[in-house]
Amino acid sequence: MTDKTQAAGLSSDATEVRSQKLDLLRQQIGDVYPAHFHRTLTNAELAEKYAGLEPDTESGETVTVAGRVFSSRNSGMFMDLHDASGKIQIFSHKDTAPEEARALLPMIDLGDIIGVTGEVRRTKRGELTVNAKEITMLCKSLLPMPEKYHGLADIETRYRKRYLDIMVNEESKLRFQQRSRIVSSLRRFLEDEGFMEVETPMLQPIYGGATAEPFKTHHNTLKLDMYLRIAPELYLKRILVSGLTDKVFEINRNFRNEGVSTRHNPEFTMMECYWAYADYEDVMGLVERMFETLALAVHGKTEFEFGDKQLSFKGPFPRVSMPAAVKDATGIDFLALKSDEEARQAARDAGVEIEKDATWGEVLAFLFEEKVEATLIQPAHVIHFPKDISPFAKEVPGEPRLVERFETYCNGWEIGNAFSELNDPVEQRARMVEQMEQAHARGEKEKTLDEDFLDAMDQGMPPAGGLGIGVDRLIMLLTNSPSIRDIILFPARRQKAD
């Protein structure tokens, strides 16, 4: 407890002291939480405007700034005031500051938000400073800030109380500023490529476009069970059918009622786009241009660090077929295997446990995940996926078990997934029926055919290339963030016990 706190008869408990100061402030000045405050410059604008001011010089100009008090020295004579753009020093001298400003100083705690009007000067040590002539209390903080020099180290508290994390950890603040810049750059890139942005339903009566467990809800007025979408694909394809645009995209949230990990959050951001009269080869080029553009937006170059790795987003990226990659890793030539049982036996011979009813394509994909995926550090396109696991992609000519699909990998993570989209309505129906039967076999009895989507396909959809990008994972790479929770402002967490 400070001498001034003791003199004022305040409690020794930090939180109680703040509440008592709030009561005193209400008595002294009335409104402690005013609705409006006019500042003339942000801290960054002030620093830029007076960058040429020499040490030990007064500007002769008065400004008004506002922000949160982060440090206080010499009984409040010096304070560091932070706004979203940066820091400025505030000086209040007992001999020069007006009485009203001096009287307010003992009531100011770290974390309070104040407004300051005064003359700009640069100290002998070169610190840009505002000499306070007027101080306005804008928001009295009732809780102490985390300790200045150690920041907010506890990882759980950082995720649960993100506002504190950003308040005191400059690295976290920068990361979320970068996230905003990346999403803006992604949107601008797609618009420059001629794509039109749309918004499709989050609540869907039939979930589809991916294989995942949905979140279920109920619409009371419509008396209808609905699902938070797992993907926007089937609605975006309806737009291609409509002729509204030949290039469409959406950046929005998907929801999957599945596991949580350093790479998975049940609510996540996806970019999906569809490009009429293009195929997966065209989309590979689009991905390479996109990655290069985003790296330049964040780093000013295409090479950057992720952990102990040096990554390069400079295209073109290598391309490898899934069967070839698995053959290189295991020696198994899947194209020479003719049946599901041959594939399962080959996996068992390689020491890999496989489900007893796994298909040829499922075995191939599983071995890829187990033996190849983690080795793909630099960006690479893995092409020619099994048709068994790709119900919306066109077959590879001459190899009916494979489809024109690729996934883009980096750091061993899947970042993008793309197809030459299937537009044969008869084949599409057959594959979706098969997909529904497989879902029912897994116990997903609510899975049904989206007949409206199939009607749209019967109307005719142009050939197209489609792409989905996991925006969160891409941001993780570009911001050197090892966990998806580091780049989602408010990640899903288990409820904290009382």
Curated annotation (Swiss-Prot):
<dbReference type="GO" id="GO:0004824">
    <property type="term" value="F:lysine-tRNA ligase activity"/>
</dbReference>
<keyword id="KW-0067">ATP-binding</keyword>
<keyword id="KW-0963">Cytoplasm</keyword>
<dbReference type="GO" id="GO:0005829">
    <property type="term" value="C:cytosol"/>
</dbReference>
<dbReference type="Pfam" id="PF01336">
    <property type="entry name" value="tRNA_anti-codon"/>
</dbReference>
<keyword id="KW-0479">Metal-binding</keyword>
<feature type="binding site">
    <location>
        <position position="407"/>
    </location>
    <ligand>
        <name>Mg(2+) 1</name>
    </ligand>
</feature>
<dbReference type="InterPro" id="IPR045864">
    <property type="entry name" value="aa-tRNA-synth_II/BPL/LPL"/>
</dbReference>
<dbReference type="InterPro" id="IPR012340">
    <property type="entry name" value="NA-bd_OB-fold"/>
</dbReference>
<dbReference type="Pfam" id="PF00152">
    <property type="entry name" value="tRNA-synt_2"/>
</dbReference>
<dbReference type="InterPro" id="IPR044136">
    <property type="entry name" value="Lys-tRNA-ligase_II_N"/>
</dbReference>
<dbReference type="InterPro" id="IPR004364">
    <property type="entry name" value="Aa-tRNA-synt_II"/>
</dbReference>
<dbReference type="InterPro" id="IPR006195">
    <property type="entry name" value="aa-tRNA-synth_II"/>
</dbReference>
<dbReference type="GO" id="GO:0005524">
    <property type="term" value="F:ATP binding"/>
</dbReference>
<comment type="similarity">
    <text>Belongs to the class-II aminoacyl-tRNA synthetase family.</text>
</comment>
<dbReference type="InterPro" id="IPR004365">
    <property type="entry name" value="NA-bd_OB_tRNA"/>
</dbReference>
<comment type="subunit">
    <text>Homodimer.</text>
</comment>
<feature type="binding site">
    <location>
        <position position="414"/>
    </location>
    <ligand>
        <name>Mg(2+) 1</name>
    </ligand>
</feature>
<dbReference type="GO" id="GO:0000287">
    <property type="term" value="F:magnesium ion binding"/>
</dbReference>
<dbReference type="InterPro" id="IPR018149">
    <property type="entry name" value="Lys-tRNA-synth_II_C"/>
</dbReference>
<dbReference type="GO" id="GO:0006430">
    <property type="term" value="P:lysyl-tRNA aminoacylation"/>
</dbReference>
<keyword id="KW-0030">Aminoacyl-tRNA synthetase</keyword>
<keyword id="KW-0460">Magnesium</keyword>
<keyword id="KW-0648">Protein biosynthesis</keyword>
<dbReference type="GO" id="GO:0000049">
    <property type="term" value="F:tRNA binding"/>
</dbReference>
<dbReference type="InterPro" id="IPR002313">
    <property type="entry name" value="Lys-tRNA-ligase_II"/>
</dbReference>
<protein>
    <recommendedName>
        <fullName>Lysine--tRNA ligase</fullName>
        <ecNumber>6.1.1.6</ecNumber>
    </recommendedName>
</protein>
<keyword id="KW-0547">Nucleotide-binding</keyword>
<keyword id="KW-0436">Ligase</keyword>
<feature type="binding site">
    <location>
        <position position="414"/>
    </location>
    <ligand>
        <name>Mg(2+) 2</name>
    </ligand>
</feature>
